Regions:
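Short, hydrophobic-biased segments on the C-terminal half of alpha helices
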Residues: 71-72
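Non-DNA-binding regulatory cores of transcription-related proteins
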Residues: 93-164
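Short, intrinsically disordered or compositionally biased N-terminal tails of bacterial proteins
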Residues: 1-25
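N-terminal helix-turn-helix DNA-binding core of bacterial DNA-binding proteins
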Residues: 28-30, 34-63
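Residues in the helix-turn-helix
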Residues: 66
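Beta-hairpin "wing" of winged helix-turn-helix
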Residues: 78-87, 91-93
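Residue cluster at the C-terminal edge of the helix-turn-helix DNA-binding motif
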Residues: 76-79, 107
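Alpha-helical residues within the helix-turn-helix
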Residues: 58, 75-76
Length: 164
């Protein structure tokens, strides 16, 4: 069992949960990473054709059951069209340049905040009026959101083509 310690900075409430390894990155969940991979995969394909779940799962190395839950989330949010049955599958319903990475990650993550106290819908922190670090965390959140909202699926495809 992994134990998690809280980093406490003097005069500031516990703000960051750190696992025993000091080089732990800020985390985007597996669901978020897989959703992004699937959206990139679909963006590389013909928008008129439906791609079977099994084909996507095999190409991306994701279990069909887990992928089905992700695709349901994407479909309900209007990110993809879904057709069930023979000849069915999934496809993007807009051009790749109309999907931002931020919108995909916000859908799957709920928040891209670096700390819990700045997350959308978080309960007001009792220290927010006297927390010297709060403006810094809020700036970081804005930077993260601006970064991810400034990149589209089309940008990722172009960047990949440029590298090759």
């Amino acid at each position: 069992m992994t134990r998690t310690a809280l980093l406490t900075i003097p005069r500031i409430s516990p703000i960051v949960s750190i696992a025993p390894t000091a080089n732990k990155p800020m985390i985007v969940s597996t669901k978020g990473r897989y959703a992004l991979r699937v959206m990139v995969d679909l963006a590389q394909r013909d928008r008129e054709e439906y791609v079977p779940l099994k084909e996507i799962a095999e190409k991306e190395g994701i279990s069909q059951k887990y992928l089905e839950a992700i695709m349901t989330t994407l479909s309900k949010a209007g990110f993809v069209d879904a057709v069930h049955g023979k000849g069915g599958g999934y496809r993007l319903n807009r051009t790749a340049d109309s999907y931002t990475i931020g919108s995909i990650l916000m859908l799957t993550e709920g928040s891209l905040s670096a700390v819990a106290c700045t997350a959308k819908g978080a309960a007001a922190c009792s220290r927010s009026t006297c927390c010297e670090a709060l403006p810094m965390w809020e700036r970081l959140d804005r930077m993260i959101n601006e970064f991810f909202n400034g990149i589209t699926l089309a940008d990722l495809l172009k960047d990949r083509e440029t590298e090759q």
